[in-house]
Amino acid sequence: CNPTTVLDYRKLLLEVDGVRNAWLEPVGTNGPPHLYLPPESTGPELQCWPEDGSVSRPNPVVLNGLYSVLIQKETGEDDKKVFMSVRERLAAHRNLCEDFKAITILCPLEIGVCADVEIDVGADAAAVYEAIIRALRSYIAPELKYYTLKELLDKGRAIEDVFAGRPFLRSRSVGFVDTKELEALHLRDELFGSDLYSAVLGVGGVVAIRSICFQTSVSPGGDTIQRVRVLPGFVAEFSLDRTCVQLQTTRGVLSLDKERIHRRLQEGTKPKRGLEHLDLPVPTGRYLP
């Protein structure tokens, strides 16, 4: 079956190799209309909205069912390959009176965090450091979790909600996503330093934060950044290379094997599960002689 809602389309696109996340935006609802009917036109000829202001009295037109598609790709994936795969998948499942104005592969904005954190004297420094990095990554670039059918049912999700809007695939799949978790993953345009404080202070063993700020690929050297704006066409991605978290106690600065911890924190690829993990078993029945 074809998608019927924006969330359904997002679930469909998550099955495409190389796609980490996807968003659909109705054209014309957020900002000025992109189509207009020329004043001199005598027929139903729509044109794109001119950016140079050459049209003085355009007649704006908003079409239902016209979307812009925004794609966050997996690290290292080829833009053109992902674009072609997304376009092919959308074309195969497009409904009548629906179309896609543009498919945009978002550029990654690498964001790290520099912090000086005090922890308890008796705390496991390596475990606290790993938990801090995970908390920072979860705030800057939260990841979707994929489930088997059993895992979602164990979370208390009703089976009709689990399968609602999920694409029917005949082979392997990445699994299920929790609809509530998917809805919560918005394409954000701002990140705030105050949220970094909340994320780190929520880690067990942390006593205080002496300093914390963002470090981005576009930030001037030496600046203390407490707010990051993510421009249109970009998506925030957490960068370990731009992150420097120093731990200390009342006894002094702690030394850690950070490279070893970083290897454990490397992002994995999306899972590929067989259909036996994505459906209920068929009852075997009883043999009656």
Could you tell me what each predicted segment is?
Residues 2-180, 245-289:
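Carbohydrate-recognition loop of C-type lectin domains
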Residues 148-152, 166-228:
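C-terminal structured "cap/appendage" subdomains that terminate the fold
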Residues 19-20, 206-207, 231:
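Short coil/loop linkers at secondary-structure junctions
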Residues 2, 26, 213, 231-238:
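Low-complexity, charged, repeat-rich alpha-helical/coil interaction segments
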